[in-house]
Amino acid sequence: MAPAASKLRAEAGLGPLPRRALSQYLRLLRLYPVLTKAATSGILSALGNFLAQLIEKKQKKENCSQKLDVSGPLRYAIYGFFFTGPLGHFFYLLMERWIPSEVPLAGIKRLLLDRLLFAPAFLSLFFLVMNFLEGQDTAAFAAKMKSGFWPALRMNWRVWTPVQFININYIPVQFRVLFANLVALFWYAYLASLGK
């Protein structure tokens, strides 16, 4: 029986290493939820920026091993660790308190809260922090906000609204930051594939 079960696990791709990694992640998530989400956000944000750079270089037919901007993934790691993970953790918990699932139309109300309050505030914070991490002055921040905020927010609303509907209504609260980070990883790659 054991060899058959072992073979079935191997065929399903659920070997002992992924199983242990998942078990460890869940344990850390239970013991240190904010730190675990912060670390996960930092790693996935950096990976997303790195992947975006590789895609851009490949599209331009450049050598992918040369001239990678290591400061980009570092900035995204800092932003993910100190902002995305912790803020996402507390926002989703507060959302559960403010709009319990028993409230009529809770899913729609949560989505509106996320899209109309959290998304614009979080996008503004992103522009501010990235501006600071890039060593830019307040004039550069104001220029980025003026030229880039509304287009970025409109694109955010178009792309992330269905994602957040699923996240808020169907993903357990402890996994919402991870789900959003995994989608963001592909979002960065998609933007890079468009040459943005």
UniProtKB/Swiss-Prot annotation:
Residues 52-76, 137-174 are peroxisomal. The keyword Transcription does not apply. It is found in: Peroxisome membrane. Keywords: Membrane, Peroxisome, Transmembrane, Transmembrane helix. InterPro entries: Mpv17_PMP22 (IPR007248). Residues 1-30, 98-115 are cytoplasmic. PANTHER family: PEROXISOMAL MEMBRANE PROTEIN 2, PEROXISOMAL MEMBRANE PROTEIN 2, PXMP2 MPV17. This is Peroxisomal membrane protein 2. It comes from Bos taurus.
